[in-house]
Amino acid sequence: MNLIICCTPLQVLIAEKIIAKFPHMPFYGVMLSTVSNKKFDFYAKRLAQQCQGFFSMVQHKDRFNLLKEILYLKRTFSGKHFDQVFVANINDLQIQFLLSAIDFNLLNTFDDGTINIVPNSLFYQDDPATLQRKLINVLLGNKYSIQSLRALSHTHYTIYKGFKNIIERVEPIELVAADNSEKVTSAVINVLLGQPVFAEDERNIALAERVIKQFNIHYYLPHPREKYRLAQVNYIDTELIFEDYILQQCQTHKYCVYTYFSSAIINIMNKSDNIEVVALKIDTENPAYDACYDLFDELGVNVIDIRE
């Protein structure tokens, strides 16, 4: 049996493609997420339907629950053996402990998003070398780090064909198929993709409200991890993540999709004549986020600078 570990709805979409490559091998699915909402629950169920066995857990960031959940994962998975393991978030401490608790023959990785192809992202760095982290690793038995898992990965499955990834051995997969519907001539619907860029909700709300007004946004699709609510825009209420939703809707409507630096627009670029994408350049206060705009330029994305 193979093991596949997901942390986001996008990873579930990728996982479905990977599972399809092994039609005669059963999979055990794991869904670890930092939030619980209908979107995450919907994709967790989709993953479970593809797997012979399934485990899910909502993760917490506070120290007490983090340690409690590490012990729970170790107890749940200790001694289990898998042929191949597939994982995206090699930086996640709880995933590192889960991997330390099991035996496996082969480790493979897959994309978490543009973080995989943006230089100097956290996947190209190592874990924090703090005394606290070292003590946790030693006392609770973590055998792995970001870089040791990169080195161990046999194959990396990527939705970004032609780009350098965290390891050299890559196998491209097509996340979504092109839509061959006829070009729609109706009025364009402007959609803003939600993205919690800043730690403070107030800053995210202020930025979104400015963009909504400036670009005449008709609809807002919140990020799966968003917990705040905007007042002056119509929400798209769907269990589907952006890629699934927009490729259904573009068959009968024409869209212009605005984002800050979401990898989602890369996933649907050139998939339909009824979808246009625009990236809005902002002050992110994060070099890894800023590097996304260089990537967008390379891909030919229309980038509009709205920095104040």
Curated annotation (Swiss-Prot):
Q: How does activity depend on pH?
A: Optimum pH is 6.0. Active in a broad pH range of 4.5-10.0. Low activity is found at pH 10.0 and no significant activity is found at pH 4.0.
EC annotation from Swiss-Prot or TrEMBL? 2.4.99.-
UniProt keyword Repressor present: no
Family as reported in the entry's similarity comment: Belongs to the glycosyltransferase 52 family.
Q: What is this protein called?
A: CMP-N-acetylneuraminate:beta-galactoside alpha-2,3-sialyltransferase
Q: Active site annotated at which positions?
A: D201 (proton acceptor), H223 (proton donor)
Q: Does the keyword Glycosyltransferase apply?
A: yes
Q: Which GO terms describe its molecular function?
A: glycosyltransferase activity
The protein's job, in short, is: Catalyzes the transfer of sialic acid from the substrate CMP-N-acetylneuraminate to lactosyl lipids as preferred acceptor substrates in vitro, forming alpha-2,3-linked sialosides. Beta-1,4-linked galactosyl lipids are better substrates than beta-1,3-linked galactosyl lipids. The natural acceptor substrate may be cell surface oligosaccharides in lipooligosaccharide (LOS), whose sialylation has been demonstrated vital for the virulence of P.multocida.
Describe cofactor binding as the record notes it. Answer: Divalent metal cations are not required for the alpha-2,3-sialyltransferase activity.
Q: Where is the signal peptide?
A: none
Organism, by scientific name, is Pasteurella multocida (strain Pm70)
